[in-house]
A protein has these predicted regions:
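Carbohydrate-active catalytic/glycan-binding domains of CAZyme proteins
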Residues: 1-169
């Protein structure tokens, strides 16, 4: 990610992948462009069913195409270094679920104890308190993941969140 260069809204050309060195601080090889369509920022990576998943937030220039502004999209590949193929949208802009909470979208997708989750932020608390300033609150919801083929379906944003998995002591 890193913003949208002028005139390059559909293909910003700002995403790269590269192999990490064994020390996890160096790189091996040269970073390679992967070109997520309408990329804005907020990249994430997962491996599901042998597929490599690259998820990201789309930019604010998606009018006139099947994508929408500031939603979480994903691409898949058989290799962590690509090539990646656009595979769809998994989370709409938070303003879809929480009126008045539109904004850029940051997320993480992860599995815990056999259940898949998506975390994200929205301005729900700010709006309920009647204040402004772009204050974001964290949310977590379930996300449908097909672990046999690596596809991800759309998640729904809620204020209820998820059920407690277990008690801590």
């Amino acid at each position: 990610g890193g913003g949208v260069p002028t005139g390059k809204q559909a293909d910003p050309g700002t995403a790269r992948v590269v192999k990490l060195g064994s020390d996890y601080t160096s790189i091996v090889g040269t970073p390679t462009a992967i070109n997520p369509p309408y990329l804005f920022e907020d990249a994430g990576a997962n491996k599901i069913a042998g597929k490599y998943i690259y998820s990201y937030c789309s930019n604010w220039n998606c009018t006139g195409n099947p994508m929408s502004n500031a939603q979480i999209c994903y691409m898949t590949s058989n290799s962590p270094l690509g090539p990646f193929t656009y595979s769809g949208m998994v989370f709409k802009n938070p303003g879809t679920f929480f009126p008045g909470s539109s904004g850029n979208n940051h997320h993480a997708i992860f599995e815990f104890k056999g259940q898949w989750y998506i975390t994200y932020h929205a301005m729900v608390l700010q709006n309920s308190m009647g204040i402004s300033g772009g204050y974001r609150s964290s949310h977590i919801d379930y996300i449908p993941v097909n672990t046999s083929n690596g596809t991800i379906s759309q998640a729904t944003g809620t204020t209820a969140g998820v059920k407690q998995v277990q008690y801590l002591n």
